[in-house]
Amino acid sequence: MDLKQYVSEVQDWPKPGVSFKDITTIMDNGEAYGYATDQIVKYAKDRDVDVVVGPEARGFIIGCPVAYSMGIGFAPVRKEGKLPREVIRYEYDLEYGTNILTMHNDAIKPGQRVLITDDLLATGGTIEAAIKLVEKLGGIVVGIAFIIELKYLNGIEKIKDYDVMSLISYDE
């Protein structure tokens, strides 16, 4: 299935000059959403994954159906102040400022094999932060799966030491 045909491109959003790749139109179509989920599940099964991790919010949209399909758990990565129990945190730089992501400190057990999912790989900052959190808890990142990779932003460089799959890529 050509998933790219289900991606909506919104010009000049969220700011002028940006061509936003909207995956909600994949989710609007049950066949396309199911296909995307199934492809990531196949990838994950080949890596003997114990738990799926996803950053808010679209990482939840991708990761939860994958975890459910595999009969395994899902561990959320959230912005600071959004998780109710004790957390670990990771602060990273953005273009203009910093961001902090957190996970419950018991979300991953040492040695667990982890798949990280998200909708899109752009600059790689969010996924790099998720990797740091998983590894801080002793998890082993065995794969990272995206619906879309924006190759022209070169985010893969931040995660080049990991096994990565993308269902769709844009070169420009």
From Swiss-Prot:
A biological process from GO: adenine salvage
Reactions listed under catalytic activity: AMP + diphosphate = 5-phospho-alpha-D-ribose 1-diphosphate + adenine
Gene3D superfamilies per the UniProt record, alphabetical: 3.40.50.2020
EC identifiers of the protein: 2.4.2.7
Main location: cytoplasm
GO MF, any single term: adenine binding
Keyword annotations from UniProtKB, A to Z: Cytoplasm, Glycosyltransferase, Purine salvage, Transferase
Subunit structure: Homodimer.
Protein family per UniProt: Belongs to the purine/pyrimidine phosphoribosyltransferase family.
Entry protein name: Adenine phosphoribosyltransferase
Organism: Staphylococcus haemolyticus (strain JCSC1435)
Designated gene of the protein: apt
